[in-house]
Amino acid sequence: MGIDPGIATMGWGVIEIKNERLKVKSYKNRPNPTNHPNLTLIDFGCIKTPPEQVMPQRLKHVYRELLKLIKLHQPQLIAIERLFFGMNSKTAMTVGQARGIILLATANFPKVEIAELAPLAIKSRLTGYGRTDKNGMKEAVKRILKLKELPKSDDAADALAVAICATMKNAN
């Protein structure tokens, strides 16, 4: 399962390898998805919070929805995009809170492995270029997962990119 952290919108995506949800022994030794014929999409979407809610309520909503998703999909690995320190401090603080909620939710499932991936590494692994734009990332996700159309949500597409990248060797 890949997650693109956010409070207003948190993207998530679940992929499967060889009919097993990321059942590979070690995160460091995962196969390269561009050479992997059995990488398939299971599900993806976004957790959205109402902007009029106060932050504690938004965090609680994200937490509860994420718990439901983890229980439903039972991933063996949850991959999270690392903070990009070039963003402004208010955005970084909000994304940091979202990441904390993801880690807290994951802590309820001790057998679930956690991987944290840098945005630049994700882009370069999937497209060969670390400064790829959103459409380039969506195209890569579409190609790798053999989708008929691009994911509409940037957040869900980013989460799928994180999940795909987590299956690759030395992704971080």
Located regions from the model:
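Phosphate- and other anionic-substrate recognition elements at nucleic-acid/protein interfaces
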Residues: M1-E20, K28-N172
